[in-house]
From Swiss-Prot:
Function: Required for the synthesis of OHHL (N-(3-oxohexanoyl)-L-homoserine lactone), an autoinducer molecule which binds to TraR and thus acts in the control of conjugal transfer.
The keyword Magnesium belongs to this UniProt entry's keyword annotation: no
Phylogenetic placement of the source organism: Bacteria, Pseudomonadati, Pseudomonadota, Alphaproteobacteria, Hyphomicrobiales
Family: Belongs to the autoinducer synthase family.
Keyword GTP-binding: no
Gene Ontology MF annotations: N-acyl homoserine lactone synthase activity
InterPro entries tied to this protein: Acyl_CoA_acyltransferase, Autoind_synth_CS, Autoind_synthase
Biological process terms in GO annotation: quorum sensing; signal transduction
Protein's recorded name: Acyl-homoserine-lactone synthase
A Pfam family recorded for this sequence: Autoind_synth
Catalytic reaction(s) noted: a fatty acyl-[ACP] + S-adenosyl-L-methionine = an N-acyl-L-homoserine lactone + S-methyl-5'-thioadenosine + holo-[ACP] + H(+)
Keywords: Autoinducer synthesis, Conjugation, Plasmid, Quorum sensing, S-adenosyl-L-methionine, Transferase
Taxonomic superkingdom: Bacteria
Length: 211
């Protein structure tokens, strides 16, 4: 499994992967989690996809998107500050140039059967490592996110605990929480699964031929 970084200038080139990503988001957020999200033609999107985020995709050897996450600079429009500000103790992020927001993190558990010793899916750990690696390479020192208590426990088990930015709050059918995570070498080494590999550009033909 590999991490593919899709920056705004690469949206068109990797359109098929992004289509898979939006379908996965619809399956996970609209289907399995039953969140109140907008799904059109089988794809989940929201207004934050219009702000030219970078996407990290966990790609299997057969060319399937096994997981994804969206990354936006915290100094610009973010889901946490504009949509879920009630999760923030002070009502705002106090964003700075070294802060990035992670959102729409999800994994297709049906594609991934291999687990590590702590029973976390390989795709989850691969994405954790990818987020930290991308953040450090992009000049960010911390990551902020809105998630739920279940995912907070997953982060803790992975050895990458989240520092809360407010109290747990009921939103829809989940108990949500906001927090910050360090983006540093120690965190990367803690979560990085064996065989981790990332590439900023990906050869689709090569991936398919390796299947």
């Amino acid at each position: 499994m590999r991490i593919l970084t899709v920056s705004p200038d690469q949206y068109e080139r990797y359109r098929s992967f992004l289509k898979q990503m939006h379908r996965l988001r619809a399956t996970v957020f609209g289907g399995r989690l039953e969140w109140d999200v907008s799904i059109i033609a089988g794809e989940e999107r929201d207004q934050y996809d219009n702000f030219k985020p970078s996407y990290l995709l966990a790609i299997t050897d057969s060319g399937r998107v096994a997981g994804c996450v969206r990354l936006l600079p915290a100094c610009g429009p973010t889901m946490l500050e504009q949509t879920f500000s009630q999760l923030l103790e002070m009502g705002s992020l106090a964003a700075h140039s070294g802060m990035v927001e992670s959102s729409r993190f999800c994994v297709d558990t049906s594609l991934v059967s291999r687990r590590d010793a702590s029973q976390l899916h390989l795709a989850t750990l691969t994405l954790f490592a990818g987020i930290i690696e991308w953040s450090m390479a992009s000049g960010y020192t911390e990551i902020v996110t809105a998630t739920d208590l279940r995912f907070e426990r997953i982060l803790k088990r992975a050895g990458w605990p989240m520092r809360r930015l407010g109290e747990p709050t009921a939103i829809g059918n989940t108990i949500a929480i906001a927090g910050r995570l360090p983006a540093d070498r120690a965190s990367f080494e803690q979560v990085c699964p064996p065989g981790y590999y990332s590439i900023p550009r990906i050869d689709v033909a090569a991936i398919r031929s390796a299947a």
